[in-house]
Design a protein with these regions (language model features):
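Terminal, low-structured helical/coil segments at or just beyond the last alpha-helical repeat
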Residues: 8-13, 182, 188-246
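Helical anchoring/docking segments at protein termini
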Residues: 1-52, 223-246
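Alpha-helical adaptor scaffolds
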Residues: 83-157, 161-164
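Soluble C-terminal extramembrane regulatory/interaction domains of multi-pass membrane proteins
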Residues: 157-203
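Solenoid-like repeat scaffolds
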Residues: 43-48, 78-86, 114-121, 146-153, ...
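N-terminal topogenic membrane-targeting module
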Residues: 24-31, 37-108, 112-115
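Alpha-helical linker/edge segments of TPR/alpha-solenoid repeat scaffolds
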Residues: 51, 68, 99-109, 136-144, ...
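Residue-level signal for cytosolic alpha-helical hairpin/rod architecture
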Residues: 53-57, 126, 176
Length: 246
């Protein structure tokens, strides 16, 4: 990352100048100064880059909302050179391209980008798991869900998607255990309580509470009232926020 390298260079230069000038506490203070200057430089450069890319993100968001999916993907791909400068930006761009491609039915492109999405891009990890599951690569699907849960432990939906896959494959006990893990994260969550009860009573999981966040994964056909929705790829923002608990 250029931002990190430049910040280190600025910090090292500051520390070296301090030491060579023989100022207070010479090299010891030079090291401290170098670290501090590097940190400040990193923050300032990162903020400058964020301000530079924000207008592009806003323009892309308008394209997504206007249904111009292919144009939005092209614009996101054009932003890839900027990932050399901004930490975490690459994973965010891959996540958004992957989600847009998956929602539009371009599974080849979706698979390529979803696999490279940042670990905290929960929706992208869920879409990647769903894609792998639909293609019969169930071990890879569970691996993607494991990553999503480790990186976003307080988000409930990954546990439910995992439980759905386990139950679908006939492993009801493992599905119950996965939702018990979710219950430990948030004991009052109604979705978890309902689905635990359904599993223990031999019923199918009810994923409707998750809305298009669930149906956008294309693991179940959405009811008629959801089909007019935009799907998960049209959601605002590039960094995923936890769902509101009911």
């Amino acid at each position: 990352m250029y931002t990190i390298l430049i910040s280190i260079l600025i910090g090292a230069t500051s520390g070296a100048i301090w030491t060579l000038l023989g100022l207070w506490k010479t090299w010891q203070m030079g090291i401290v100064l170098g670290v501090l200057v590097s940190g400040v430089s990193f923050v300032l450069i990162s903020r400058w880059m964020a301000k530079r890319v924000e207008p592009q993100f806003m323009a892309i968001q308008k394209q997504i909302q206007g249904g111009q999916t292919q144009l939005a993907i092209a614009q996101l791909e054009d932003m890839m050179p900027l990932t050399r400068w901004q930490v975490l930006l690459k994973g965010q761009i891959h996540a958004q391209i992957g989600l847009l491609a998956y929602a539009s039915g371009d599974e080849k492109r979706a698979e390529e980008h979803l696999a490279k999405a940042g670990i905290r891009a929960t929706e992208a990890k869920l879409a990647h798991a769903a894609l792998e599951y639909r293609k019969g690569r169930k071990d890879k699907a569970r691996e993607a869900l494991d990553i999503a849960i480790r990186a976003n432990k307080k988000q409930i939906m990954p546990y439910h998607v995992y439980a759905w896959m386990l139950a679908k494959d006939g492993d009801r006990d493992a599905a119950i255990n996965k939702l018990v893990e979710a219950e430990k994260v948030e004991s009052s969550n109604e979705s978890t309580q309902e689905n635990l009860s359904r599993l223990r009573n031999g019923k199918k999981l009810n994923m409707k509470r998750f809305g298009m966040g669930w149906f956008g994964l294309q693991l179940e056909k959405p009811p008629a009232q959801y089909r007019a929705g935009q799907g998960m790829a049209g959601r605002k923002g590039f960094r995923q926020k936890p769902q509101r608990r009911r």
